[in-house]
Design a protein with these regions (language model features):
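Bacterial N-terminal signal peptides
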Residues: 8-18
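N-terminal cap/lid segment of alpha/beta-hydrolase-fold proteins
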Residues: 21-45
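Short, surface-exposed "cap/lid" segments of acyl-processing enzymes
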Residues: 38-75, 79-82
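The feature captures the conserved acid-bearing segment of alpha/beta-hydrolase catalytic domains
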Residues: 41, 156-206
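Catalytic histidine neighborhood in serine/cysteine hydrolases
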Residues: 78, 204-219
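Alpha/beta-hydrolase active-site loop
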Residues: 89-110, 129
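Primarily recognizes the serine-hydrolase "nucleophile elbow" in alpha/beta-hydrolase
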Residues: 105-106, 114-169, 177
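Catalytic active-site module of serine/aspartate enzymes centered on a nucleophile-bearing elbow/loop
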Residues: 223-249
Length: 249
């Protein structure tokens, strides 16, 4: 009995070691939330992955609900908490480098050669800077983006005063960055109650689809409707066949 117990204990220890080692990834320091696809539909493997930049409240209800809906549609999601990442200042260049790390790892892990970016509020104001700073081999993987209630600028750092709805403009204007992105479909979804919104300023940019919803900053918590609008606006990018470009090495 004692010998059997010792053998069992040794086996359990041996089994635990690889598990601990395999859990580590090159992007663990970014504290990402992952929503892998559980679908067995073969067609889903050709859909893009999603990187979701959260609002300044962190990985909260809207971010997680919309991401879960997208995962059910066959698109695995990497959730990136703006609250965690931007609690200390990051430059646009540093943000782009960390985004590149995410693409490099999860495009291989999930075998997806295309990616769609979605940002909510603070996240929508920052991800255009990441797109415009991508090296060509990663830039070509980005096939679409959705900006949910973005304002016109960002500080690339979370300020408590932002939660008090102060109106001071951020250090980095978002509009010039979005204007540099002309080759992929973009959705800009905004609320009729928002002031200082970026979306109306993009009305003349041909690759941008503008949609307005009621319900304030979180669109009345109608997460299924938000997901539907994203899927509609980015349908060509989502359904397009995988290009010959393999995930970047």
């Amino acid at each position: 009995m004692m010998i059997r117990w010792c053998i069992t204990a040794l086996l359990l220890c041996a089994l635990q070691l690889p598990l601990s080692a395999s859990a580590a990834t090159p992007v663990d320091d970014l504290e990402l939330d992952l929503l892998p696809v559980t679908s067995v539909n073969p067609a889903d493997k050709d859909k893009p992955m999603v990187v979701f930049f959260s609002g300044d409240g962190g990985w909260a209800e809207l971010d997680s609900a919309v991401s879960a809906n997208l995962a059910k549609q066959g698109m695995p999601v990497v959730g990136w908490s703006s609250l965690t990442y931007f609690w200390s200042f990051k430059t646009p260049e540093q943000t782009a480098k960390d985004f590149q790390r995410i693409l490099a790892y999860y495009s291989k892990e999930w075998q997806r050669s295309r990616v769609i970016l979605i940002g909510y509020s603070f996240g929508a104001e920052t991800f255009p800077f990441a797109i415009t700073r991508m090296p060509p081999e990663y830039r070509k993987m980005i096939v679409g983006g959705a900006m949910l209630v973005p304002s016109i600028s960002s500080n690339f750092e979370i300020h408590v005063s932002d939660w008090l709805q102060t109106s001071a403009p951020g250090r980095y204007p978002t509009l010039p960055e979005v204007k540099k992105i002309q080759d992929i479909p973009l959705l800009c979804l905004y609320s009729e109650l928002e002031e200082g919104d970026l979306c109306p300023l993009l009305s003349k940019q041909s690759n941008v689809t503008l949609m307005q919803l009621s319900g304030g900053h979180n669109f009345g918590k109608r997460y299924a409707l938000i997901t539907k609008k994203i899927l509609q606006a980015l349908a060509p990018a989502i359904q397009a066949p995988v290009s010959q470009a393999a995930p970047a090495k």
